[in-house]
């Protein structure tokens, strides 16, 4: 994880955008399984390391949230207490070499992020769903991403559990 954090920061530093990522809290780290079998193995592997794990069907796949007992070391981004474990979309395979698909940085206002990225001509895309809005920046040739999000995965998960949309595993 520290190597990924450094690569993410170097990407933004190379565009003169270090101020975008300095001191931003990492909301969570997301890993994508190669297939359903590996996804299930990840759940079994991480379950003993959590205070709570839940999952939610998202279309034809499942996405789990693991609340870790001991935070992950995210290098210069600090500690991360949430891990998102994603089953790949049908027909898709994970392309990342070290299992990390993306990290999400929590920001109260996405407008300064989009303005700074536009000003430096950094390619990004917007991701909007019922849970949150995110600015997504691909940082390397493996398709790994940094996402700036306006809502915490913990808050999203709490809402989904309360509504019965997500189920607790532990």
Model feature map: region roles:
Residues 62-65:
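A binding-site-centric feature that preferentially detects glycan-recognition modules on secreted/surface proteins
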Residues 1-27, 31-57, 67-170:
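Glyoxalase I/VOC metalloenzyme domain signal
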């Amino acid at each position: 994880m520290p190597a990924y954090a450094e690569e993410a920061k170097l990407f933004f530093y190379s565009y003169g955008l270090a101020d975008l990522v300095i001191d931003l809290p990492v909301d969570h780290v997301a890993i994508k399984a190669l297939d359903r079998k590996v996804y299930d193995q990840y759940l079994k592997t991480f379950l003993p390391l959590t205070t709570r794990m839940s999952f939610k069907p998202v279309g034809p796949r499942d996405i789990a949230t693991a609340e870790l007992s001991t935070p992950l070391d995210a290098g210069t981004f600090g500690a991360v207490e949430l891990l998102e474990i994603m089953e790949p979309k049908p027909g898709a395979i994970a392309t990342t070499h070290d299992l990390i698909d993306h990290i999400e940085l929590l920001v109260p206002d996405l407008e300064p992020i989009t303005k700074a990225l536009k000003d430096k001509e950094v390619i990004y895309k917007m991701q909007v769903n019922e849970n949150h809005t995110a600015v997504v920046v691909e940082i390397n040739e493996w398709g790994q991403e940094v996402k700036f999000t306006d809502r915490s995965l913990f808050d999203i998960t709490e809402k989904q559990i309360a509504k019965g949309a997500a189920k607790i595993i532990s």
